[in-house]
Each structure stands twice: as structure tokens, then as C-alpha cells.
């Protein structure tokens, strides 16, 4: 769905965003496989999640270049399937590709995560391209463009499990009030309360 001149540019960017229930195990497998092909300086790094928006995740690097990010799913994310390297089940291989809605939800979360390893301009460009593809193919519900798929990867959190996780996280962070991690999990912002506080402060100054 991408014009040839744009496709040539993207092919030079060997970046992957991958969902895995066991991202650390997958990182170890990938690093071992790449190292066996005589590449050096291959390693992976773990990064903390961002509240309830982005889970704990890992990057895989060859030297200074990041080639993949791996995320543990926070919900059940929809995907479509395609076959490559053959048309039949005997000689082909099925791969899962996230739906455009799933990709956009992650990309927009990356923008607001404020992490130095995310290239905001690249993310915005890819988000715009995906949005345009979706707009131009609104009525096409086949292949990778199928928007609503019954297939999903990961486990959808229930209200009970979310409460349990938040309680456990509060016990872990209650001694770190004022830190960024605490605010990402428990920041409470109520606009009308803040407006009322500013109004009271203004009246007090005038008096």
C-alpha cells in the first residue's frame, strides 16, 4: 500500500515493534540467533513501563542501532494474518500483522511516553501514513486492511485484575510520592478543582 519511492526509504529502516507474552525470553533467543550469524555487539535492554499506557518493554541493539522493540501486551490486541514464502500450508509461513487501529494506538502512546529512544518524527510520519491508508480503504475489509478482526493477541484486563495490579503498585511506590513513576500511576488531575484553587489564590492576593 506504500508508493515505491517511499517503500525504498522504509526498507532501509530495519525496525520492528513486536508483541510477546514472554518478551525477555524472545530477546534472548533473537540475540543468540543474531550472534550465531557473526554479528557483534548484540544486546538487549529492559525498560520500565509507562503507567497503564505502555508495558515493560525491551530493545534489541546491534552496536548502537536499535533493530527491534518488544512489548508485553496490556490488552488483547487485534491482528490480521498473511502467508509468506508460499501459498500452501505445506510450504508457506503464517505471520501476524497488527491491524492499523492497533498500530495507531501504540504509536500515539509512544509520542506521549516522553522516552528519549522514541523517534517522534518517525512515529508521526508512520501514523499519518497508516491513517491515510485507512481513510483511502475504508470499505475494504480484506487482508491486512481488515479493520475489525476477531483475532487478538494478549489478555484483556478485567476490572478486578486492574484493581489488584494498582493496589500492588501502590504498596510498592507509596514511599516514592512525588517521583515520576508514582505520578504516572496515580496522578489525579481534576480541572475544576485546579481552577477553583487558582481562583481562591487570586482572591487572596487581591486582599
Model-found features: residue ranges?
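Active-site nucleotide-donor binding segment shared across nucleotidyl transfer reactions
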Residues: 1-24
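Active-site and adjacent loop segments of nucleotide-processing enzymes
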Residues: 67-206
Amino acid at each position: 500500500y506504500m508508493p515505491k519511492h517511499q517503500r525504498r526509504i522504509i526498507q532501509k529502516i530495519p525496525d520492528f515493534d513486536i508483541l510477546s507474552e514472554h518478551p525477555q525470553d524472545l530477546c534472548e533467543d533473537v540475540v543468540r540467533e543474531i550472534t550465531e550469524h557473526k554479528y557483534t555487539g548484540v544486546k538487549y535492554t529492559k525498560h520500565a513501563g509507562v503507567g497503564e499506557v505502555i508495558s515493560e518493554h525491551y530493545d534489541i541493539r546491534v552496536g548502537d542501532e536499535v533493530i527491534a522493540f518488544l512489548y508485553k501486551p496490556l490488552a488483547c490486541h487485534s491482528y490480521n494474518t498473511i502467508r509468506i514464502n508460499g501459498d500452501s500450508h505445506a510450504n508457506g509461513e503464517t505471520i501476524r500483522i497488527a491491524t492499523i487501529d492497533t498500530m495507531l494506538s501504540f504509536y500515539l502512546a509512544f509520542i506521549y511516553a516522553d522516552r528519549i529512544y522514541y523517534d517522534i518524527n518517525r512515529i508521526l510520519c508512520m501514523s499519518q501514513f497508516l491513517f491515510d491508508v485507512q481513510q483511502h480503504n475504508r470499505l475494504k475489509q480484506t487482508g491486512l486492511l481488515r479493520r475489525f478482526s476477531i483475532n487478538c493477541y494478549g489478555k484483556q484486563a478485567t476490572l478486578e485484575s486492574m484493581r489488584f495490579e494498582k493496589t500492588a503498585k501502590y504498596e510498592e511506590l507509596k514511599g516514592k510520592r512525588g517521583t515520576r513513576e508514582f505520578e504516572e500511576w496515580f496522578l489525579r488531575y481534576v480541572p475544576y478543582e485546579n481552577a477553583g484553587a487558582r481562583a481562591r489564590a487570586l482572591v487572596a492576593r487581591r486582599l
